[in-house]
Every structure is written in C-alpha cells, then in structure tokens.
C-alpha cells in the first residue's frame, strides 16, 4: 500500500506492522557508504519499517438500506480469541431517557460484560476494504449487536513472523490501547485465530493527512496551524504518559469525521521509563540529528518531527529532502534547510525554533501552543470529544 503506522498482550501475540507506504526502507543502522540514490533522479523519501495504517477517505456510516459486503476474508480455522475489548470509558455510549438508577446499573453491568468479552470474527459484518498492506488489510466493519462502525485491521501471522515484526505489534497494542485523547486514534481491542491477528480500531472516514497533502500540494497557514495545535495537544498527552511516538509524519496522521487530526500507528512508539533511548527508527526525512547519529534521545525527538511536519505542510515537501540518503543524512546532521519566499516570518520562526540540533534548545510543546503564529492562525481545536466503542452482547 502507498505511504502512510490496553492491555499488554496477555500472551505473546503475533503482530504486525500496519500498512506502510511503498517507500524505500532503511534498517536500524544507516550505512556510511553505498546508500544509493534515486534511480529516477528525483528526490525520494526514506522509510524505516513502521506500523503505518493508511485508511482512505470513506463514508462514516453505511448508506441507508445498504448492507455490508459479504466477508472478504479468506477462510480460516475456527477463531480462538484470547483477548478482549478494552473497558469502555464511562458515558462513552449515549444514555437513553428513563430511570437514572436503573440506567446506571445497566451501564455498569454492560461495562462488566464488555470487560469479560472475547471477540471473534463472527461478531462483525465485514464491508469493503479500506486499505491493503504488506502484512494484511484494513476493512470497514460493523459490530453486529451495536451496529457500531469501525475499522478492522487483519494481519497475517506468517507474514509477521517472516518479517520479524511481532514485537512492533505487541508494542503498538500495549501503548495505543491505553491512550485516550480526541486526537489519537482509538484501539478498542484485539483478538486472533490460528492464522490472523485482528485489531479493532476507530474508523477515520476522511483518510490520511498525507492523501490530503498530495491532493492539495500544500496547506494554508490556518490549516497548518490547526493541525500543529491538535498534534501538539496529543503529543503533550503522550509525553505525560511517558510515551514517545518517534514516527510522526503525514502517513501516520488520520482525519476524523469532523476533520480533526488523529495520530495513528504507534508501532515505533515506546514507553520510556528511562526517557532515553538509542534505537534508530522512523522515516529518515523526519529523524532528528541525535537519532541518525546514534546518540541518546528522549521525547524531544517528537519536537523535531513537529517542526519537519509544519514545514512540509506549508511547503509541500520535507525540509531535508534530497536525491540520496547520504545527502539527506548530511543535511539533517548540519540542519541545512531553506524557506521558500512565500513562507511567512512567523512560520519561519516557529519551524526554526523546533529544528535545533541541540534538543534542549527546541521549543517545548507548551511554547509551541503559545507561539504567536499558532495563536494567530489556529482555529479552535475540537473539544468535548468522546469516542464510543462497540458494546458486548447481553448474556
């Protein structure tokens, strides 16, 4: 597929890298020689393996009278689910009118039932494919009892094992299932059978930010500032939970039904009890100097990526893009980039203060949100957003 990534799994779950873009992959260590160049002579963006979920624009709900297409998944042995849906947050489902006490008791009972629920493929009507990737597919789906519309990511165990990426899926499930923020894609639960792993995900009907960027070439200042505001809010939440994303890029950002930005693909994310790591990961265009140079890094890597993203939104290409990996590497290490004339002074100031070689000199997320250019151009971010999730059957 083209470019685009709560529980700790009770058993080792064979996992996957979501549907990544068809870009050149790089390994954990970037060789100092023979990095190669784009055969076409055009600049290429370089991608490390990641769990990118690419969900194209689709309708939020199935049309009136429209039934989901028959299951399009290959036949498999009887599902043997081992995991359950995460406990829904209180009041995530709208309550009907009636006796408050009885409704509260029913809600509590439903919550307990959901906690004990073990999902199988038979619980879902499977609709059209939303995306295809190296390790599986994403389908539009509907939970049969609640009629809740969602995205079902289906990953093939054999392909995950062959690529040795099970650990990335475990990490994605562990981290994403614990996060609750309006600008972070929800992972409601997961289950597996003999051949496949299934992730029950929030459906983002407007597709990826990357597709929007391709369609429009670049964004105006108002849209860019609004996206950066939403992203900064979401990253502040992640960092408060000691989670570093490490792979922020347009392919990993989805759009909800109201156009709100949602971070997806936590395959390269980490819980950071030490807050310092040395692993190389993510997309080369977005990697900060400390990561490509193999130095220790912390949550400030996400600040660098925020600056790169802001630049790409406004200009239509990343600031360090080059014809070869070596040149991109060199530009990042030296922080060599220029602004087109149409980029305003306020935007230049914000980006330049995020793209600092010394991580300690980068703006904090709080400072990003208070930056004059952001405050002057960002529309009010979505508020009061609560996500719903499928409910369990009555016993």
UniProtKB/Swiss-Prot annotation:
Entry-linked Pfam families: Pkinase (PF00069)
Boundaries of every Protein kinase domain copy: 124-374
Catalytic activity as recorded in UniProt: L-seryl-[protein] + ATP = O-phospho-L-seryl-[protein] + ADP + H(+); L-threonyl-[protein] + ATP = O-phospho-L-threonyl-[protein] + ADP + H(+)
Biased segments, Polar residues type: 29-60, 84-99, 376-385
EC number(s) stated in the UniProt entry for this protein: 2.7.11.1
GO biological process: anterior/posterior axis specification; apoptotic process; cell division; centrosome cycle; centrosome localization; cilium disassembly; liver regeneration; meiotic cell cycle
Protein purpose: Mitotic serine/threonine kinase that contributes to the regulation of cell cycle progression. Associates with the centrosome and the spindle microtubules during mitosis and plays a critical role in various mitotic events including the establishment of mitotic spindle, centrosome duplication, centrosome separation as well as maturation, chromosomal alignment, spindle assembly checkpoint, and cytokinesis. Required for normal spindle positioning during mitosis and for the localization of NUMA1 and DCTN1 to the cell cortex during metaphase. Required for initial activation of CDK1 at centrosomes.
Name used for this protein in its record: Aurora kinase A
